[in-house]
Amino acid sequence: MSDRKAVIKNADMSEEMQQDAVDCATQALEKYNIEKDIAAFIKKEFDKKYNPTWHCIVGRNFGSYVTHETRHFIYFYLGQVAILLFKSG
């Protein structure tokens, strides 16, 4: 199990879905080392579980300004890695 601490910075999402995002990201970080692969894993899992179209950005340093569907947005840190996950389109 991972010792990465989850810190949710901003969320417009149910508590259950937030926990799912953290769990999914934890799995992705254990499975992959490349940020693009981590993002792809999370995006595909959320597309499967909560229907398309999800978008995921993973990294240590990025700015963002996105439009998202209501109740389908989360921005959080898992250890040193920031994860932005949102549904749009």
UniProtKB/Swiss-Prot annotation:
GO biological process: microtubule-based process
Transmembrane segment boundaries: none
Family annotation (Gene3D superfamilies): Protein Inhibitor Of Neuronal Nitric Oxide Synthase (3.30.740.10)
Predominant location: cytoplasm
Cellular-component GO terms for this entry: cytoplasm; cytoplasmic dynein complex; microtubule
Keywords, in A-Z order: Cytoplasm, Cytoskeleton, Dynein, Microtubule, Motor protein
GO molecular function terms attached to this record: dynein intermediate chain binding
Subcellular location: Cytoplasm, Cytoskeleton
SUPFAM superfamilies named in the record: DLC
Family, as annotated: Belongs to the dynein light chain family.
Function recorded in the entry: Acts as a non-catalytic accessory component of a dynein complex.
Name of the featured protein: Dynein light chain 2, cytoplasmic
Gene: Cdlc2
